Amino acid sequence: KYMRVVGPKSAEFFNQGVNNSEEYAYWMKNVMPYVKDQAGNKRTARLKDLSYNWDNSEGPKKYVEFTTIRLNPGEGRDWFTMMRNDAKLKKANGFTGIRGVFWLVSGGQSEMHVVEPYDSHGVRKGVFSDPDFDYNDSYNEMFGWRARTYDQMNAGMSIRDYGGQFTETLEFIPEMSTSIE
């Protein structure tokens, strides 16, 4: 499976279109003849309150854990609450990992993408500044008694039963990439 990511771009970039660009001509001539299935364009927008340590000026990492979440219609609030609380706690306690949470603006059914880039398998995707940090206790102190258990349970129930969550590991291949400029 191959995924082409064009980002970060503004809405104006998409308004101008790319059909007449050199990149598009190259893509059509050298890549599209080998594409078996094309899912089409999907546009996403990052939810800053649910993300942490995301910096558009940094170059890409070697790998990305890419999780797709499909929420039950009308029941996503609990999932958003847990993700927002998790991000708030990690930001407040010096967590070094990176997470971007994106919602699908157009190009498919309603879904969220949780993107966690990293450079090496077998290495934690972030640590807290205090090595003795207790995540569960700190979560409950920040958001209320037994909040972690309650939030986790309700967030899980917000996700569709069938095909509601799946995770893929993506690999960045520089030879197949262009600049983010």
Residue ranges and their predicted role:
Residues K1-E181:
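Short S/T/G/P-rich N-terminal loop/turn motif that feeds into the first structured element of a domain
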